[in-house]
């Protein structure tokens, strides 16, 4: 991902993450954008050049259809990765781009020395959950809540 692609991605991602955190009941609408900005600033202090973070643009026929962000978990566990974000833009969903991109991301992760990848998916994101399950990802933790 180059600097221009990162600028496009980060403005989209901050808003999208804020919406997901609101939908999941974690954040209020009043605080969501600020908290989302803070999260991205903390995780990507050097933007697309942040060490051990690999932000990849996903193209189909020279058209940007999405992106994926893979991070090596920690210096003490360089063989473990974490997918912080994975987006196929809405107009390109359901066309096989997600499955293809996940397969390619796994190849890249292996080339970087990773042998395990984790990710988080919001409970309300049934489409993403379905894709990850089809790709062989297994549930390792479940957080549940109830409004009373």
Residue map of PLM features:
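Residues that form or flank phosphate/diphosphate-binding pockets in enzymes
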Residues: 78, 96, 127
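Acetyl-CoA-dependent GNAT
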Residues: 3-89, 139-148
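Conserved acetyl-CoA pyrophosphate-binding loop and the N-cap/start of the following alpha-helix
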Residues: 92, 96-104
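Conserved active-site alpha-helix within GNAT-family acetyltransferase domains
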Residues: 99, 123-141
